[in-house]
Amino acid sequence: MNIQEMILTLQNHWSEHNCILMQAYDTEKGAGTMSPMTLLRSLGPEPWNVAYVEPSRRPDDGRYGENPNRLYQHHQFQVIMKPSPDNIQELYLESLKKLGINPLEHDIRFVEDNWENPTLGAAGLGWEVWLDGMEITQFTYFQQIGGLEANPVTVELTYGIERLASYIQDKENVFDLEWNNGVTIRDIFYQPEYEHSTYTFKESNTDMLFDLFSMYEQEAKQTMEKGLVFPAYDYVLKCSHTFNLLDAKGVISVTERTGYIARIRNLARSISKIYVSEREKLGFPMLQEKGAK
């Protein structure tokens, strides 16, 4: 099964279980959790079920396309269900079966790994899902998002597409994975992988990036003051990616790093509060729609 078939299989599976199929969010981010389709929509009482593929940029993991297992950009298949269904583990195992992985024939373990994202003020109870000794999914019940209590509890499933494909296709080098009809990850992503690594570690203008961080931070604050949640959150994502570029280049000290993370977290918390307040003013419309049904 190639990657394109894997994605279609997961989309069909979760669509059958009432998930909206969304597209990737069009701003750089380090994880699918950072999409507003997860971070903001997990807040408040309104129900929300969604699934989407998210390209995730981790500048510090860039290796010029030379490492068989580490990538500047990898792909996650993200599933969010709020409130969490009682049979979520069964639904997940069923999705593996549809990918050709029979749980009765493999060693599938849920290894406790409580999750935290300090930058977003987010945390939860969670497990890594290991398939025959390799992590393929992160399974998390959100307890806190944007510094706010998650109520009702949202469950997040994050499949590592490349890791899962490495197992299914029995490949040791991620660049040998087939995306579709003989086209490999190397064909599609090797050049951007090499060039983004070169930019991150050698060519980025650090003075400009420091200035951009401050500009994005200020714009996020000003936009929040206008009550414009989603544009403000876009600038928080830009702050996060800019910080990741600076951090990967090693130009931020340990002390400064803590301060930058706190600045991003404070923005995320403020936006989260405004988002819930704005939805409350609207009468939590998706909650009303569910009640009407």
UniProtKB/Swiss-Prot annotation:
GO terms for molecular function: ATP binding; catalytic activity, acting on a protein; glycine-tRNA ligase activity; transferase activity. SUPFAM superfamilies: Class II aaRS and biotin synthetases (SSF55681). Its EC number is 6.1.1.14. PROSITE patterns: AA_TRNA_LIGASE_II_GLYAB (PS50861). Transmembrane segments: none annotated. It comes from the Bacteria. It catalyses: tRNA(Gly) + glycine + ATP = glycyl-tRNA(Gly) + AMP + diphosphate. InterPro entries: aa-tRNA-synth_II/BPL/LPL, Gly-tRNA-synth_heterodimer, Gly-tRNA_ligase_asu. The keyword ATP-binding applies. It is found in: Cytoplasm. GO terms for cellular component: cytosol. The keyword Transmembrane helix does not apply. It is an enzyme of class 6 (ligase). Keywords: Aminoacyl-tRNA synthetase, ATP-binding, Cytoplasm, Ligase, Nucleotide-binding, Protein biosynthesis. Tetramer of two alpha and two beta subunits. Belongs to the class-II aminoacyl-tRNA synthetase family. NCBIfam families: glyQ (TIGR00388), PRK09348.1 (NF006827). This is Glycine--tRNA ligase alpha subunit. It comes from Oceanobacillus iheyensis (strain DSM 14371 / CIP 107618 / JCM 11309 / KCTC 3954 / HTE831). The lineage of its organism: Bacteria, Bacillati, Bacillota, Bacilli, Bacillales.
